[in-house]
Every structure is written in C-alpha cells, then in structure tokens.
C-alpha cells in the first residue's frame, strides 16, 4: 500500500510525519514532491536515470533566496555547520529536509542516492520515484514508505492520478491560524507575497520593483530582501490557504471514500494516542511495538493563537478570506 499525508502547509503535517517515523518499519519521506519541478515531477515522458538525478538534486530557488538572507526555516535541518554545503548555497532539494530525516550523514546518503538513480533505466518520473523508494526501504531496513509534503493539498489531484491505489490522510488546522503561521514563516512569506502581489511596508508595489531575481546576491534593499522584511496583509495568506482547500476538495471527487481520511491537528495534539491508533488502522500499518507511545511524547501542545493579536479590521478580512475553506472542513 502507498500512503500519503496531505495538507495545506503549517497544518501540523510535519509533526505527524515525525510521529509516524517512530514506527520502526516506517520510511517517512519528508518534502519530496513539493520542491520538484512541477512540470517534470510526474511527466509521462521517459527520462534517463541521470536526468532523474538532476531533477531531485536541483535547488529550490525560493528556499535558497530565503536562506541566503539569513532567515531560519525550522523544517530545513541540513547540518550547514558540519555538512559540505553552507547556508545560502544552492542546496540540492533532497538535502533540504528529506535525507537529513533519514540519516545522520545526509551528504553520504545523497551520494549513494545519486549513484543508485543514475543506474535507473529510461522511464517516466513516477517509475523513478517508486524505484527510489524501494531502494531506500532496502538500504535503510524499512518495511513501508509514506510521503508528506507541505502544501500538497494544492496538487492533491496529481497525487490521486499518479497513485491510483494509495491512501491519503488529510490533516488540517484552523484556517486563520494556519494562514498567520505562514505569514511568520519566510519560506511561505516570499512565494505567497509574490503570487498575490502583496504590498510592501513602505507602500511600494511588487510591480514597481522591476524584475525579481531569486538568484541575485542580497544587498538589504534588493526586491527579495524587501519582500521578506515586510509584513504582508494576513488576508492574502488566508486566500492562499483557502485556495488550497478548494483545490483539494475538488480533487476528492475522483477518490473512493475508503482511500481518504481526515484528522484535525487540534485532535492529534490533544488526544495523540487515540488519533494515532485510528491513523494506524486507516493506513493498515504493521505491528510496531510501542511506537505510538514514543510518538505521543513528541507533542508540545497547540501553538498559542495569533488571531487575537490582529486589529479588528485585519481579523475580519482574514476570517472572510478563509471562510469558504472553513466551511468545507466543518470548521464554520
């Protein structure tokens, strides 16, 4: 069985992936598909193993731009102090979060992965993904894999089409809180501000800044630095969150009910053993000892609400932007 955790981003999916990684048989794949070239990650045309290696080892320019300007991103756990790459280098995508979660020496595992995939026969990217997962299972002594990427509910339809027998667990969080978490998360702040043309703190518009070069060196006043330093309107992030929920629910029409389940982030945190037991049953996980007890120990409580910090007008605009998604999730 193929298993996926999907969500909007800033919804608790990272915690859930960490929890499921406590199962001794689990290969918990963090952040693979969301950082790959969207036009190529599931393209049907055959590609060589070398081309596939280039696909998964390419940098994600948004991530590079954020790190190059000194911002921390909690999900990026590559060991810059001891690894071969330094902060601001064009970090290969699978070294951003995936391989550091699987090995204490991600650079060495990266080299092994690259050597392995270059030997793949010409085939579509999807077949390469499956071969990579199978190799990692054998290499790391695991029994099953599950993949989780931030904002994957946005391309849920692609996952359903490409993994027609998979089961999908959707974890969701209160919309305004998820949106405000994105505002404070610079790897979300940059792309969402660019997508929706968020105004800068000084009143400038993105359209007035000229061409945006994600690869340009930071100067402090370059357009990317100015976007990252500004506080964009929370309602734009509510709109982004809501758009993802709408995209995901449209894709549900093509999925059998027994292949889909939902869990609230708040329930996972408040009743972790009960919720994890239900997730294990849905995913038909094999017996794994006391992994649920260990996983429950990872909970640190629900983050403090940010909504009360907003001025009334901002809060009303944010809640309005999120309303359609909240209704679909049964939260309004």
Label each PLM-derived region with a short phrase.
Residues 15, 155-161:
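A short acidic, amphipathic alpha-helical/loop segment
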Residues 6-8, 146-152, 172-173, 265:
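Short His-Asn-centered micro-motif
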Residues 34, 173-177, 268-269:
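Conserved nucleotide-binding/hydrolysis micro-motifs of P-loop NTPases
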Residues 32-145, 195, 204-225:
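PAPS-dependent sulfation machinery
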Residues 1-9, 57-58, 78-84, 121-123, ...:
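PAPS-dependent sulfotransferases, especially Golgi type II membrane carbohydrate sulfotransferases
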Residues 148-149, 159-184:
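Conserved phosphate-donor/acceptor-positioning beta-strand/loop module used by diverse small-molecule
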Residues 14-26:
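A conserved segment at the C-terminal end of the G1
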């Amino acid at each position: 069985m193929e298993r996926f955790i999907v969500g909007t981003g800033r919804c608790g999916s990272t915690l859930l992936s960490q929890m499921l990684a406590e199962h001794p048989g689990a290969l918990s794949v963090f952040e693979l598909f969301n950082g790959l070239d969207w036009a190529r990650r599931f393209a049907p045309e055959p590609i060589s193993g070398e081309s596939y290696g280039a696909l998964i080892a390419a940098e994600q320019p948004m991530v590079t731009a954020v790190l190059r300007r000194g911002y921390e991103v909690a999900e990026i756990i590559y060991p810059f102090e001891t690894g071969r790459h330094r902060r601001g280098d064009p970090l290969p995508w699978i070294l951003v979060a995936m391989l550091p979660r699987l090995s204490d020496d991600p650079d060495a595992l990266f080299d092994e992965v690259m050597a392995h995939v270059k030997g793949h026969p010409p085939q579509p990217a999807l077949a390469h993904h499956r071969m990579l997962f199978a190799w990692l299972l054998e290499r790391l002594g695991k029994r099953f894999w599950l993949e989780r990427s931030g904002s994957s509910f946005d391309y849920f339809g692609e996952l359903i089409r490409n993994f027609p027998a998979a089961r999908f667990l959707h974890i969701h969080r209160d919309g305004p809180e998820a949106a405000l978490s994105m505002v404070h998360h610079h790897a979300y702040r940059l792309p969402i501000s660019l997508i929706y043309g968020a105004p800068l703190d000084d009143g400038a518009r993105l359209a007035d800044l000229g061409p945006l070069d994600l690869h340009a060196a930071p100067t402090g006043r370059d357009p990317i630095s100015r976007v990252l330093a500004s506080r964009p309107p929370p309602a734009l992030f509510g709109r982004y969150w809501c758009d993802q929920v709408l995209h995901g629910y449209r894709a549900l029409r093509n999925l059998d009910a027994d292949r889909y389940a939902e869990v609230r982030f708040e329930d996972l945190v408040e009743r972790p053993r009960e919720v994890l037991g239900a997730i294990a049953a849905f995913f038909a996980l094999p017996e794994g000892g006391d992994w649920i007890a260990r996983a429950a120990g990872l909970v640190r409580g629900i983050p403090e609400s940010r909504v009360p910090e907003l001025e009334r007008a901002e809060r009303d605009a944010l809640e309005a932007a999120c309303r359609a998604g909240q209704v679909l999730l049964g939260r309004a």
